[in-house]
């Protein structure tokens, strides 16, 4: 039986019912709906709608229902109830009879679903924060094990300057640190209770909403009922957080897909996160990483879809807002799964140090060092830049590295170049010179690892 049938003389068309009902996805809010209902029952005692005995009877029945839901949440899907609120109320009435019909006094599904969704989001944020932190830890652990793994750094996907695999890991650690911070900020804004705002104008009962918020574990209660039942900013923020986080994971995946390719061959992925070809026996495909990269698009789509759903809605509640859940549920599930999978990839990764170093020594990645050397000799940087460009052209013509050019050849481009240039052009020197904060020198990378460990402690 629908919760709103009294106004209607005809039953809903079955096709409309299937189109309208949301239990198939909002059943995931069952625990939150029950918790919110327990809180509301306590509030109704304070305004003399329920006696203490009635409230205790309702709470006991709701607690029992919560245990059932936690044991088998998908059993809810066997019902033909319209939504999770209807299901909980109908089950409650089965347990306590007509007393269950009193629980919805002064409450609307509009403030009820807003409360359920915020409680669910709070729980999801706690899980996501843990997952982000676990991947941060995995990146720091991998960085610490690969401080001496020198590899090319890239701009425009062309070798630019030498870095280390540790420095690369720490770059993604910084991105994930920002992801964590965004989740924490989002939690601060959504941690306000909608319950007691009714359909749109507030409840007619003198409920102490701040006390109710405290019972439910919120920091405070919302301040405007019209805004409260219409507000889905927290959904947009979480989808934005997930979208940004997935962009970071997609870039992480793309880098490792390239590093794992035969063309780069900097790393080898574990058999545990790769698959083969049904035709080509030699193939070892980076499927885990490709799926992370591919799943980024569906999360971006969920954010865009929710933006478009909300952009034209008048105040207050509209049924369009039922579309807030499926995309959110899927996006956060996807983000969580990809965080876990990225950590699994790092667990078994093998860095091929000799090949990484060989690649770092190619591509004239020490050209900037030669330019800096000339500047130290008094040559203006723009002129030094031009001189080094000419020297690189000559090195390419001879098929040699810059440091392999004879001194006489180098001096054709600038007379200030002396024998002391060769130690400057050495690979380790290129790293050692990048000793400012955030740089790739061994000392700075070690310091960054230590700092990251402290932040994770």
UniProtKB/Swiss-Prot annotation:
GO molecular function terms noted in the UniProt entry: argininosuccinate lyase activity
Main location group: cytoplasm
Pathway given in the UniProt record: Amino-acid biosynthesis; L-arginine biosynthesis; L-arginine from L-ornithine and carbamoyl phosphate: step 3/3
One cellular-component annotation, GO: cytosol
Enzyme class: lyase
Signal peptide: none
UniProt catalytic activity: 2-(N(omega)-L-arginino)succinate = fumarate + L-arginine
Database matches in NCBIfam families: argH, PRK12308.1
Family: Belongs to the lyase 1 family. Argininosuccinate lyase subfamily.
Protein name per its UniProtKB record: Argininosuccinate lyase
Organism of this sequence: Pectobacterium atrosepticum (strain SCRI 1043 / ATCC BAA-672)
């Amino acid at each position: 039986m629908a919760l709103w049938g009294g106004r209607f003389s005809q039953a809903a068309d079955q096709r409309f019912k299937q189109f309208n009902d949301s239990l198939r996805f909002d059943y995931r809010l069952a625990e939150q709906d029950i918790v919110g209902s327990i809180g509301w029952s306590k509030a109704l005692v304070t305004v003399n709608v329920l006696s203490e005995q009635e409230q205790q009877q309702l709470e006991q029945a709701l607690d029992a229902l919560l245990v059932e839901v936690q044991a088998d949440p998908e059993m809810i899907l066997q019902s033909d109830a319209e939504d999770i609120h209807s299901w909980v109320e109908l089950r409650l009435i089965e347990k306590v009879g007509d007393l269950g019909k009193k629980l919805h006094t002064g409450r609307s599904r509009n403030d009820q679903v807003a409360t359920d969704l915020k409680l669910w989001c709070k729980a999801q944020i706690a899980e996501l924060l843990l997952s982000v932190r676990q991947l941060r830890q995995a990146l720091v652990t991998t960085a610490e094990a690969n401080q001496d793994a020198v590899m090319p750094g890239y701009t425009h996907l062309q070798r630019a300057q030498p870095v280390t695999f540790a420095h690369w890991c720490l770059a993604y650690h910084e991105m994930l640190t920002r992801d964590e911070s965004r989740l924490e900020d989002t939690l601060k804004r959504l941690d306000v209770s909608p319950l007691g705002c009714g359909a749109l104008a507030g409840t007619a009962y003198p409920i102490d909403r701040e006390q109710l918020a405290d019972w439910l574990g919120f920091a405070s209660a919302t301040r405007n009922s019209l805004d409260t039942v219409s507000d889905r900013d927290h959904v947009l923020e979480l989808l934005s957080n997930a979208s940004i986080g997935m962009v970071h994971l997609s870039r992480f995946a793309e880098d490792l897909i390239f590093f794992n390719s035969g063309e780069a061959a900097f790393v080898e992925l574990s058999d545990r996160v790769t698959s083969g070809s049904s035709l080509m026996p030699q193939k070892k495909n980076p499927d885990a990483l490709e799926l992370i990269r591919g799943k980024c698009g569906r999360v971006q789509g969920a954010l865009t879809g929710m933006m478009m759903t909300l952009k034209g809605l008048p105040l207050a509640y509209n049924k369009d807002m039922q579309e807030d859940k499926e995309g959110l549920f899927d996006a956060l599930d996807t983000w969580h799964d990809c965080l876990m999978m990225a950590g699994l990839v790092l667990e078994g990764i093998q860095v091929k140090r000799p090949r990484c170093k060989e690649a770092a020594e190619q591509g004239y990645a020490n050209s900037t060092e030669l330019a800096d050397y000339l500047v130290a000799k008094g040559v203006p940087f723009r002129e030094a830049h031009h001189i080094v460009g000419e020297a690189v052209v000559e090195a390419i013509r001879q098929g040699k590295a810059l440091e392999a050019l004879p001194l006489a050849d180098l001096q054709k481009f600038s007379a200030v170049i002396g024998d002391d240039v060769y130690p400057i052009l050495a690979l380790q020197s290129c790293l050692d010179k990048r000793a400012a904060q955030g740089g790739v020198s061994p000392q700075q990378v070690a310091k960054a690892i230590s700092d990251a460990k402290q932040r994770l402690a």
